[in-house]
Design a protein with these regions (language model features):
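N-terminal export and membrane-targeting signals
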Residues: 3-8
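Ser/Thr-rich, Pro/Gly/Ala-heavy low-complexity intrinsically disordered linkers and tails
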Residues: 1, 12, 16-32
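Alpha-helical interaction segments
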Residues: 9-10, 231
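Beta-strand-centric surfaces of beta-sandwich/beta-rich domains
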Residues: 31-205, 210-310
């Protein structure tokens, strides 16, 4: 499997141009349009870090639209991503996988993401994601046990859906991510990316934004910029890497081909080693993510442009 570094380089610079066994998981419907999926328990020894995946049927017998989701993660969870996938069912067994590779390469489509223990999200009225009938869901769960005791990793997702056939008019949404792999933080030092600018395609609209750093992160900021260099309209300022905000943008950001997003990540390296970009929770990342519409596919941004994953 491709590493997350090479995958993100591919996502942000090229591709977008064009597992140990475990147990525990389920998916089910609640009878009110909600569909649920879970993973775990995943036993974690002290200082253990692992990423596991599992594929299960979502349980939707007809085409539905996703209006929002709730995620609840147990202590020790670093992140959880739910994807639409064409892969075959593995549940109740898990398998080892690399974090974020389903975002950057392949054909899996991320539909829900949590980087905090409790996330609730609803799309604005008139925006939703398409989920075909009889879909399979892949759950990717990244855990790190920083305690002196054993932990049991667990994650649950509740998808709020409605039958597509009877849904009111909506615009189809998709996932957008921007970031950099150019991270090298000297020992016992502070470091900043400085402002980085990306301009999503004209005619698209961003409706939610969140940020993602690892344990040395001290601040992640995002601005809605009329042009490169404009820092007059800050839309998020996360100072707790472990619990970044999910911000619904009101008003939404309407991209016109000139305006865009500016983002900046800051860190303080309290270790005696240089810390660089990487997939481990002991490495670092600088990613902003969110949802946009109308869907042109998964968008990844580096430099000024954003391109669709092929």
């Amino acid at each position: 499997m491709a590493s997350i570094r090479s995958g993100l380089v591919t996502l942000f610079a090229a591709v977008l141009v064009s597992c140990s066994s475990g147990s525990g998981s389920s998916s089910s419907g609640s009878g009110n349009g909600d569909l649920q999926a879970s993973i775990g328990p995943i036993p974690l020894k002290p200082s253990e870090e692992t990423t596991v995946c599992m594929v299960m049927p979502l349980g939707n017998t007809e085409d539905v639209v996703l209006d929002g989701f709730d995620m609840k993660l147990a202590p020790g969870s670093h992140h959880l991503i739910a994807y639409l996938t064409d892969a075959g069912v593995t549940a109740p067994n898990t398998f080892a996988c690399s974090p974020f590779t389903g975002v950057v390469i392949g054909t899996d489509v991320p539909i829900a993401f949590a980087n905090a223990e409790d996330i609730s999200f609803s799309f604005p009225k008139g925006v939703a994601m398409d989920i075909p009938a009889n879909s399979n869901i892949k759950i990717e769960a990244h855990y790190i046990n920083a305690t002196a005791n054993e932990l049991q990793g667990h994650g649950q997702v509740t998808f709020h859906t409605a039958p597509k056939a009877s849904a009111p008019p909506y615009q189809a949404a998709n996932f957008l991510a921007a970031g950099t792999v150019d991270i090298s933080i000297p020992p016992n030092s502070s470091y900043s990316t400085g402002p980085l600018f990306a301009s999503p395609p004209a005619g698209t609209h961003m409706v939610i934004v969140t940020t993602h750093e690892h344990r040395l992160g001290t601040r992640a900021q995002v601005w809605a910029s009329a042009k490169e260099g404009d820092l007059s309209h800050e839309i998020t300022d996360d100072r707790n890497w472990a619990s970044p905000a999910w911000r619904t943008l009101s008003p939404q950001i309407d991209f016109d081909g000139t305006n865009g997003l500016t983002y900046q990540c800051d860190w303080t390296n309290t270790t005696d080693q240089t810390v660089t970009f990487g997939e481990s929770a002991l490495d670092e990342m600088c990613i902003i993510a969110g949802y946009y519409y109308p869907s042109q596919g998964i968008l990844g941004c580096i430099g000024h442009g954003c391109k669709t994953r092929q």
